[in-house]
Amino acid sequence: MTERTLVLIKPDGVQRRLVGEILGRIERKGLTLAALELKTVDDELARRHYAEHEGKPFFGSLLEFITSGPVVAAIVEGPRAIAAFRQIAGGTDPVEKATPGTIRADLALVTQDNLVHGSDSPESAAREIDLWFPGR
């Protein structure tokens, strides 16, 4: 069964010119890029995307980071796309929790600036895809 997930290449990944490397890893895994856009994230979209973190101590810095530069947003499809992308992304802490060979372990150093976001469940994927790609 084909599944869809939202993948974001965050401002640090775009700024460091890692978009091609990251998209290549997604495609080499066997996943399909069904939609792809370079976006400027405004405060409203950032707040809606990270609504679950509102009230947490890091919420402000999270919003500041995601709005600090362009983001590549993608709808990624394939069998078990959510789990497959999260596997190649690696743990959120790129130094202590990400497995070598993953995007974060190989290319990132700081937890907040960890290059990519991927939906964590089918429900999150549906909500996030609707936010970033309305009507898709």
From Swiss-Prot:
Pfam families named among the record's database cross-references: NDK
Family annotation (InterPro entries): NDK-like_dom, NDK-like_dom_sf, Nucleoside_diP_kinase, Nucleoside_diP_kinase_AS
Catalytic activity as recorded in UniProt: a 2'-deoxyribonucleoside 5'-diphosphate + ATP = a 2'-deoxyribonucleoside 5'-triphosphate + ADP; a ribonucleoside 5'-diphosphate + ATP = a ribonucleoside 5'-triphosphate + ADP
Cofactors (names): Mg(2+)
GO CC, alphabetical: cytoplasm
Enzyme Commission number(s) of this protein: 2.7.4.6
GO terms, biological process: CTP biosynthetic process; GTP biosynthetic process; UTP biosynthetic process
Active site: H117 (pros-phosphohistidine intermediate)
SMART domains recorded: NDK (SM00562)
Subunit organization: Homotetramer.
UniProt cross-references to HAMAP family, sorted A to Z: NDP_kinase
Function: Major role in the synthesis of nucleoside triphosphates other than ATP. The ATP gamma phosphate is transferred to the NDP beta phosphate via a ping-pong mechanism, using a phosphorylated active-site intermediate.
Protein's recorded name: Nucleoside diphosphate kinase
Organism: Mycobacterium sp. (strain MCS)
Biological classification of the source: Bacteria, Bacillati, Actinomycetota, Actinomycetes, Mycobacteriales
